[in-house]
């Protein structure tokens, strides 16, 4: 029995959490573990404490039970897909109140902030890592759907360099549990509503190509994007469209979340964008990273972010 299952076995009240602005991997891993525990362990009080994810993940069993509030009575905290305490947001306080804590993560920038830490940065996703810690014979269809979703999203539908033979084998084993895997990919990764598609077109129309075509960036202020969509999560995927432009090595997408506050997303083909994100106070992976920055957008770009990108491109 590995450390995760040992801690679950010995706990009564369990809180499962993940990073702020939960994506497919964070949502999938937290709900996968929730389903696995509730289906295989008796007498456990389990709560998923997480910012409400995008409604496109409503199909995952347990989605409607997610609570944004900390679970103060938890004697075990399981953190999934978060690289440091700050990424847990207000739910980070549970690290102080829970008797035991364990972090399961695949980010190279992980700070080993929990009492116990299982971090494997070579994994495509936290869902892939979590799969290796669970008993396959006890993985239900509900759990498999969650795990598969996370792997699909963090591997870029199996096209990022973090995808390995084992990633594909695990995905295949999950598909064997029996669910419509093509619908998951289509509905949660590719499909966008009309206004979100129009917003994507606006970003691409106004995007800038610099540094001999090796960097492409797009910007949105708060009033612009809120004029098209009601949820920032509907901008997921814009950064990938910038990265997919021929010749681009590093893509940048920055949008305003509040006055003088901006979310920065970075993607690359070969360059290490995690170092750039870390310098900006964020984190992530070598090929996919992000941060939240404060200041005027044009000043941040000209004085800080673009010089960092140029330096990384020049080696």
Give residue ranges: language-model regions.
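Generic enzyme active-site microenvironment
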Residues: 17, 21, 79, 103-104, ...
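Solvent-exposed alpha-helices and their adjacent loops that cap or buttress functional pockets
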Residues: 69-71, 93-96, 110-111, 139-141, ...
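Short alpha-helices
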Residues: 104-170
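Short glycine-rich anion-binding loops that position phosphate/pyrophosphate groups of nucleotides
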Residues: 20-22, 82-85, 107-109, 222-223, ...
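Active-site cofactor/cluster-binding pocket
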Residues: 59-116
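Short glycine/serine/threonine-rich phosphate/pyrophosphate-binding segments
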Residues: 24-30, 85-89
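Glycine-rich, phosphate-binding/catalytic loops in enzymes
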Residues: 33-34, 94-97, 119-120, 169
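Hydrophobic helix-and-loop "lid/oligomerization" segment in the mid-to-C-terminal part
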Residues: 2-18, 28-58, 68, 73-76, ...
């Amino acid at each position: 029995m590995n450390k995760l299952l040992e801690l679950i076995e010995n706990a009564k009240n369990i809180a499962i959490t993940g990073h702020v602005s939960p994506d497919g991997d964070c949502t999938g891993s937290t709900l996968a573990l929730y389903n696995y525990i509730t289906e295989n362990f008796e007498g456990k009080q389990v709560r998923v404490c997480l910012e409400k994810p995008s409604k496109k993940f409503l199909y995952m069993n347990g989605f409607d039970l997610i609570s944004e509030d900390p679970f103060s009575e938890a004697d075990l905290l399981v953190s999934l897909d978060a690289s440091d305490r700050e990424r847990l947001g207000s739910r980070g306080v549970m690290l102080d109140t829970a008797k035991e804590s364990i972090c399961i993560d695949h980010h190279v920038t992980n700070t080993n902030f929990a009492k116990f830490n299982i971090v494997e940065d070579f994994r495509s996703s936290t869902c892939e890592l979590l799969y290796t810690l669970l008993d396959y014979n006890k993985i239900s269809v509900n759990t498999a759907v969650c795990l598969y979703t996370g792997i699909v999203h963090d591997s870029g539908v199996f096209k990022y360099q973090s995808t390995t033979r084992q990633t594909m084998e695990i995905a295949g084993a999950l598909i064997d549990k029996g669910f419509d895997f093509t619908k998951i990919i289509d509905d949660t990764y590719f499909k966008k509503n009309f206004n979100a598609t129009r917003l994507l077109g606006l970003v691409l129309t106004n995007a800038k190509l610099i540094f001999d075509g090796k960097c492409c960036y797009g910007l949105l202020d708060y009033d612009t994007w809120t004029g098209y969509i009601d949820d920032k999560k509907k901008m997921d995927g814009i950064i990938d469209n910038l990265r997919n432009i021929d010749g681009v090595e590093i893509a940048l997408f920055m949008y305003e979340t509040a006055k003088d506050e901006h979310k920065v997303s970075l993607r690359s083909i070969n360059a290490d964008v995690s170092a750039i994100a870390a310098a900006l106070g964020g984190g992530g992976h070598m090929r996919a990273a992000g941060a939240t920055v404060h200041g005027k957008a044009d000043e941040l770009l000209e004085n800080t972010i673009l010089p960092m990108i140029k330096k990384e491109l020049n080696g």
